[in-house]
Amino acid sequence: MEERSSRCLEVGAGAKRGQGEWITIDMNDACDIYWDLRKGIPFPDRSLNKIYSSHFLEHLTFNEARGFLEECKRVLVPDGKFLICVPNARIYLEAYVKGEPLDANRFFGWAPAYNHTTKIDMVNYTAYMDGTHKYMFDEENLLFILGANGFRNPRLRNHDPELDLQERAYESIYAEADR
């Protein structure tokens, strides 16, 4: 029987340090491991039980995201869990199409748009975050991308207050899948 690791990895964690079983990785000196995840995940095959990604995948191009998801599968143990949340493009696009005001306090409470002179400027800011966002997601394409990259049983999940940031709850899609 294969020995299962007790390690869990949070990718794109920013300045956050891991606690308990969690290890953090990002291009930030304050996290546990400083690493560019576009170059792979520096762990052996089948060495992690869980990977958690919060508002990271949208910072990769489509092809970079495919490579990243392949790496996640590689380092997860069989039946390991991949948990993810990404910005929900639908809320911004629906507000735009319906002509609803894109209130900076509602849509950008954590960082006001630097240029919100028109509604489409606010949508563009959300989509590209001054050039740091490379891809937009809705529920359908997030689940499709997980399945297309070989994850089993991709499904939506609820916001988990022990894992997910409360300030991201309104704007996020939450999903999980099995290796």
Where are these regions (language model features)?
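Conserved alpha-helix/loop element of class I SAM-dependent methyltransferases that forms part
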Residues: 1-5
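Conserved SAM-binding loop
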Residues: 6-94, 175-179
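S-adenosyl-L-methionine-dependent methyltransferase catalytic module, highlighting the catalytic core
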Residues: 64-71, 77, 81-178
